[in-house]
Amino acid sequence: SVGFKAGVKEYKLTYYTPEYETKDTDILAAFRVTPQPGVPPEEAGAAVAAESSTGTWTTVWTDGLTSLDRYKGRCYHIEPVAGEEDQYIAYVAYPLDLFEEGSVTNMFTSIVGNVFGFKALRALRLEDLRIPVAYIKTFQGPPHAIQVERDKLNKYGRPLLGCTIKPKLGLSAKNYGRAVYECLRGGLDFTKDDENVNSQPFMRWRDRFLFCAEAXYKAQAETGEIKGHYLNATAGTCEEMIKRAVFARELGVPIVMHDYLTGGFTANTSLAHYCRDNGLLLHIHRAMHAVIDRQKNHGMHFRVLXKALRMSGGDHIHAGTVVGKLEGERDITLGFVDLLRDDFIEKDRSRGIYFTQDWVSLPGVIPVASGGIHVWHMPALTEIFGDDAVLQFGGGTLGHPWGNAPGAVANRVALEACVKARNEGRDLAAEGNDIIREASKWSPELAAACEVWKEIRFNFQAVDTLDPLKS
């Protein structure tokens, strides 16, 4: 018998297994690995697999008390990144037994909890995860799903319109509610608490909830349409968050909101369960995501955060605009928009999708386009996102020279014009500006909006881009 041999051995002897056939029940991860100079890619990939599963820096005698073969993560494939020196994609397979059922928190603690500070790596980024069907089935997922939301709101055949109330901090509850009412009356479907509006000295949450509910009901009575305001239930403790959600339910409003990254996955999953049990829609804001996902060589790609949110639960999530002021390339964005909405997504490296993902009927999430968009963007947004999206114009509603309600009218008219043109078979990409101009002839509100924002552009290079595909 070999017995226990103390000492340090190379990770790749145990954790680099290029002959391994992945199982249907494995969680698969694609990591972008940048090793330190002199560290071979196999050792770096194996180190990631080891440190995010059963390994530690030295051999321990207690390894003999378990079956490492059954529980270890395995680096099963490594490929160099085209156009980058010394950067590799390492594919790691994790056995399902390593993860607690129904816990996104535990999944992330295992896969990305420790290994990102590892000295042998210069940088590390989790690009994508393949979640096996067996694991997905342990999650409730979004409280409702896209079709259920449309049925609750009685809105079909078009994207939904929203608006974040600005200035985001400093308004009293009554003035805030007034701004909500004006927007909803003008034709928007939703208004939104800003992500940093929780319960501050200038506006406590209970006052805001009351005035916003009043605003929504008044607008509903006047327009004959169902209206909602995303009441942000994010709080300092889970108990307080649920207390706010309970109050929202007692007011009878249709939707609440949560900042899922700052609030945390445990809190988010609790809130999603509450929302399903009590018929509340759940709007998710991704505040803090760019801290994690913006750098191309380190962190975690947003498509991973989005998949995790679909498992944890949320009916809407902010997903970039492609055309506004915030980061988001078209192919990458559409890749994770499909991951949020569709039931089955094929592997497609040209859109940054590393694995085929089957969601086995887990409800979908509606992507929200928000950030620096206005009426001139409407044709592009309608074309890029299709019907199942929320288009959110904060400044693009409240910045209208005549006020909030005319700003809302302008957006609704522009949207209806784009949907009508699309349904008639017109090319929104080519004819977008003409469609908006035609509509503005019979809508003075839209004409005024077109004039204000005709020259606005946010032209900066995207930081996070796709790798060139090997020819």
Swiss-Prot record:
It comes from Strychnos nux-vomica. It is an enzyme of class 4 (lyase). The modification N6-carboxylysine is found at K192. The record marks K325 as: Transition state stabilizer. Binds 1 Mg(2+) ion per subunit. The active site is at K166 (proton acceptor), H285 (proton acceptor). Mg(2+) binds at K192, D194, E195. The basic functional RuBisCO is composed of a large chain homodimer in a 'head-to-tail' conformation. In form I RuBisCO this homodimer is arranged in a barrel-like tetramer with the small subunits forming a tetrameric 'cap' on each end of the 'barrel'. This is Ribulose bisphosphate carboxylase large chain. Its cofactor is Mg(2+). It comes from the Eukaryota. Substrate binds at N114, T164, K168, R286, H318, S370. It catalyses: 2 (2R)-3-phosphoglycerate + 2 H(+) = D-ribulose 1,5-bisphosphate + CO2 + H2O; D-ribulose 1,5-bisphosphate + O2 = 2-phosphoglycolate + (2R)-3-phosphoglycerate + 2 H(+). The gene is rbcL. Its EC number is 4.1.1.39. The modification N6,N6,N6-trimethyllysine is found at K5. Keywords: Calvin cycle, Carbon dioxide fixation, Chloroplast, Disulfide bond, Lyase, Magnesium, Metal-binding, Methylation, Monooxygenase, Oxidoreductase, Photorespiration, Photosynthesis, Plastid. GO terms for cellular component: chloroplast.
